[in-house]
């Protein structure tokens, strides 16, 4: 007898079990005895604990035109309108460090599963986070290289980069070696037609964008140890940048050098019914600056992450699953200036746990299950202790699938979040000059911003609530939609100055530097704590793909996936300091924001040709000079739209064939011939436009004022060796 699993693909695992005896079946403890001679069992390799809400096969992944898995995840995050970075699992399991797989080529992926909200608690994710399951090829190997040349059509700021990569997967063993180099030419003031701004860059040697050189290397390996799996990573990077600025009438040359070395070691496996993961990571970095201020800084950090999950109780409707996790992190930062030396030590200790309880399971046998469908509640909590104080986290959620193709979910979280090491310890430095509208003087000026971290940041406290409805997929087009509502309230939220309005300068006068004539020359844009904020909005995401013939190879059938996202802000308010009035940013107080935004994308591939196109639009908005009332000196920005386009051509046909089991590369989806990519960002060279409240032209919003780059053409040559 042969037992078939419906919808099983050629990539599924197949086990052949001959002549199973009665005693063997009874001893296995897997239920009632079935007397069969031979059994063929088929099951999906790498399947997650729950079925996917959305699945992309190899052809759809290749149509994204991505260089690596990290770019694939970025594209998915945009298409699905995810508010947070997704939690990534590999082959249906949590691994110690999923990030080590981010540099692998996209065709190392067999399929991608976007899991429903119920998976978040099952895998220990943060409330509201989406879980993405990446199923890798069983056997895979490649040598890849590419050269990328980009240049604005207006000239200047050319960029040249190169990548080399060696990757391999053999069962549970995997490794990758990668090297990247890049050089960015400076953009000089003389290369742009800009009107002279008060106190601005009249010298043609002044750089509007710095020159930058970067070299980075990465090595990762994953190895099995009996029932365990270990992962090791080592990465290094060096970066240098040079710039020339006009600061208070003086020409200042600046040179920054950054070097970093990082590594991690992790292990995952099962013991005593628990699925366990642990990861130890560390990094050392050094930065040096000459020019605006002489000095150097050093930073060392060490972190340990532990997590575990297991099923506590098996109920008729499913198992009660718990997830526990802990995080220990410490860092030391030293900043050495010409006349001072300061050392800071930061630490974070946190632990959290979740409990997922199934209340109902859809089936045809129980009346309650038929009426209610799948229903699960999630409860969670945590404690956090760090340098700035401590806090707690409480969360809850509900996931309900009353019918096939319909899933409703909600999530609520109240927490005190930790402050990242980078936000606190990064040394301050002067960035590239930029044009800003000075509301106090009513003129456009060129300022030199102060960037970096802020050691005085306090842990923010936030409360989040979300509702989401997911529909589909329906029809042969795989039509699917997500409709969501989000509300976030924060106290001591971390942000930057919203805009350079009178309200903002009155609240933070120490962050504005003016010369003897009162002209604005520099603004401190390092992160700071805002007293309180409230954001409320709606999101909509629709995805569908062109139907393909069953069994057609990806080079024989057209692959096309469409996505459409729409965002609407209902409320956006902020109080800069305690005791100061609340500013309504949708009305333009304290720096206006767009109420609506829209994004559409198309990813298509047929044979040797590929097309990736996207269009984005955001509504216009007003920024008030003084909060609470419109003024003729307000800044009114027009709606903005831009289109990006990418064409891909493979020099020879990339026929897909199923490799023999002894062949190292596995099923091939990419040939070794040269691939040429031509990409145009901002196809129609759109630039921000604005006017004043009285209808006159706004200073600082000429063609080359706010957007110095405009349309960029990028040519990529890549090949598999």
Model-based region annotation:
Residues 61, 616-626, 650-721:
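C-terminal beta-signal and adjacent terminal beta-strands/loops
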Residues 417-482, 518, 523-538, 545-548, ...:
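Outer-membrane beta-barrel signature, preferentially recognizing the C-terminal barrel domain
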Residues 95, 104-142:
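A beta-strand signature from Gram-negative outer-membrane beta-barrel systems
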Residues 486-497, 502-625:
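Gram-negative outer-membrane beta-barrel transporters
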Residues 282, 287-377, 577-603, 614:
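Outer-membrane beta-barrel transmembrane domain signature of Gram-negative proteins
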Residues 12-62:
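Short, acidic, small-residue-rich periplasmic hinge/interaction motif at the N-terminus
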Residues 144, 154-266, 270-273, 280-283:
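Transmembrane beta-barrel wall of Gram-negative outer-membrane proteins
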Residues 139-142, 171-172, 224-229, 269-277, ...:
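Short loop/turn motifs that connect adjacent beta-strands in outer-membrane beta-barrel proteins
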């Amino acid at each position: 007898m042969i037992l078939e699993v419906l919808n099983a693909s050629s990539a599924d695992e197949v086990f052949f079990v001959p002549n199973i005896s009665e005693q063997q079946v009874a001893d296995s403890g897997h239920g009632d005895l079935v007397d069969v001679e031979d059994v063929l069992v088929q099951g999906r390799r790498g399947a997650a604990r729950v079925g996917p809400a959305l699945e992309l096969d190899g052809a759809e992944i290749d149509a994204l035109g991505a260089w690596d898995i990290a770019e694939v995840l970025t594209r998915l995050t945009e298409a699905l309108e995810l508010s947070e970075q997704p939690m990534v699992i590999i082959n249906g399991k949590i691994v110690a460090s999923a990030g080590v797989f981010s540099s692998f080529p996209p065709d190392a992926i067999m399929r991608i599963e976007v899991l429903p909200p119920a998976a978040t608690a099952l895998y220990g994710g943060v409330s509201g986070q989406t879980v993405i399951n990446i199923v890798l090829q069983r056997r895979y190997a490649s040598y890849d290289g590419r050269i990328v040349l980009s240049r604005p059509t207006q000239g200047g700021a050319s960029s040249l980069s190169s990548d080399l990569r060696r990757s391999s997967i053999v069962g549970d063993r995997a490794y990758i070696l990668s090297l990247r180099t890049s050089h960015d030419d400076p953009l000089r003031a003389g290369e742009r037609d800009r009107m002279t701004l008060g106190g601005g860059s009249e010298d043609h040697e002044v750089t509007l964008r710095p020159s930058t050189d970067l070299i980075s290397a990465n090595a990762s390996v994953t190895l099995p140890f009996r029932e365990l799996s270990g992962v090791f990573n080592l990465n290094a990077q060096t970066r240098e940048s040079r710039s020339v600025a006009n600061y208070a009438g003086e020409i200042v040359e600046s040179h920054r050098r950054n070097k970093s070395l990082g590594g991690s070691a992790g292990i995952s496996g099962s013991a005593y019914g628990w699925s366990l993961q642990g990861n130890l990571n560390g990094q050392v970095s050094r930065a040096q600056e000459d020019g605006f201020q002489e000095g150097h800084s050093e930073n060392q950090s060490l972190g340990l992450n532990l997590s575990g999950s297991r099923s506590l109780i098996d109920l008729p409707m499913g198992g009660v699953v718990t997830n526990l996790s802990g995080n220990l992190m410490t860092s030391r930062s030293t900043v050495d200036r010409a006349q001072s030396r300061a050392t800071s030590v930061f630490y974070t200790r946190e632990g959290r746990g979740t409990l997922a309880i199934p209340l109902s399971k859809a089936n045809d046998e129980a009346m309650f299950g038929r009426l209610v469908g799948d229903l699960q509640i999630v409860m969670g909590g945590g404690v956090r202790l760090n340098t700035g104080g401590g806090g707690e986290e409480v969360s809850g959620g509900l996931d309900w699938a009353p019918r096939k193709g319909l899933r409703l979910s909600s999530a609520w979280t109240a927490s005190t979040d930790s402050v990242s090491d980078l936000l606190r310890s990064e040394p301050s430095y002067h960035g590239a000059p930029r044009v800003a509208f000075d509301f106090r003087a009513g003129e456009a000026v060129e300022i030199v911003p102060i960037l970096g971290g802020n050691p005085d940041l306090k842990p923010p406290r936030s409360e989040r609530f979300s509702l989401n409805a997911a529909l589909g997929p329906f029809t042969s087009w795989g039509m699917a939609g997500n409709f969501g509502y989000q509300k976030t309230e924060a106290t001591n939220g971390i942000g930057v100055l919203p805009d350079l309005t009178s309200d903002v300068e009155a609240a933070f006068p120490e962050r504005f530097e003016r010369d003897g004539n009162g002209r604005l020359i520099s603004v401190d844009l390092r992160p700071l704590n805002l007293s309180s904020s409230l954001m409320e909005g709606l999101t909509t995401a629709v995805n569908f793909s062109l139907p393909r013939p069953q069994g057609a190879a990806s080079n024989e059938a057209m692959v096309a996936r469409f996505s459409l996202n729409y965002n609407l802000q209902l409320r956006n308010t902020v109080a800069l300091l305690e005791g100061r009035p609340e500013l309504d940013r949708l009305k333009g107080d304290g720096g206006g924001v767009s109420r609506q935004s829209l994004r559409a994308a198309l990813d298509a591939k047929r044979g040797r040709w590929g097309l990736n196109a996207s269009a984005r639009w955001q509504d216009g908005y007003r920024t008030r000079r003084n909060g609470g009332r419109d003024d003729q000196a307000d800044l009114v920005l027009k709606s903005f739209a831009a289109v990006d386009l990418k064409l891909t051509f493979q020099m020879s046909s990339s026929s897909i064939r199923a490799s023999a089991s002894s062949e190292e590369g596995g099923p091939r989806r990419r040939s070794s011939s040269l691939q040429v990519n031509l990409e145009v960002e901002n196809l129609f060279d759109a630039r921000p436009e604005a006017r004043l409240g009285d209808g006159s032209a706004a200073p600082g919003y000429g063609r080359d004022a706010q957007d110095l780059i405009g349309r960029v053409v990028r040519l990529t040559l890549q090949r598999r060796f």
